[in-house]
Amino acid sequence: MKVFVLSLASDVKKRAVFERHFSCTKLSFSFFDGVDGQELCRKPSASDKLLYMPLEESCLTPGEIGCALGHFAIYREIVDKNIPFALVMEDDAYIAQSDVTDFLNFLDAYGDGVPKNSVILLTSNVQYSPLARTNLAGVYGCYKSGNGTYGYLIDNEAARKLMTVVLPIRYEADFWKGLQYSAGIRIMVCKKSYVRNGDLLYTKSYIAHDRNKMKELRSDK
């Protein structure tokens, strides 16, 4: 299975931590260079070309813009290289040692029957209907709410459709509720949260600080 890990090229320490933690899975992976949104947004003329509306009106933070561009680039890589499906993670995510065997078995089952046109969220704090069972054991449809792009499975068809709506950037990369309708893809949820957030307090997050400042502004809009 192809595994992409989104990470800023300059963030050597986070890459080293991820590599150390992920080694327990014995899976090969590739770091995928992310986009530094802070650097990009220092030149509004450059960032505005990528946005649905000017930066100051968009209610998006520079970090969110960089994150969206990074995930878009991964979708493009999947499509351009005709990769049938992939696991996408971010560099602050990890798989707990106690979950490794179950996680690998789950990936094998997924590979044997990849749901078409789908994104499967492997993260926590996601709401879904337990009645909406799928053919893949432990995976449910009827996604309701929840964010996070630090761990998910995606097939080629879903990546292709997401590419058509991500640019110009209007939403955060993890606005799954909006993306599932605008792109016409299926958002599914794994009951067991195999991919964990290694920075729950967001002490090392480039996005969280500015994102919290935006919450009140977004609620007004």
Residue map of PLM features:
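An acidic/histidine-cluster motif and surrounding catalytic segment
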Residues: 1-89, 93-221
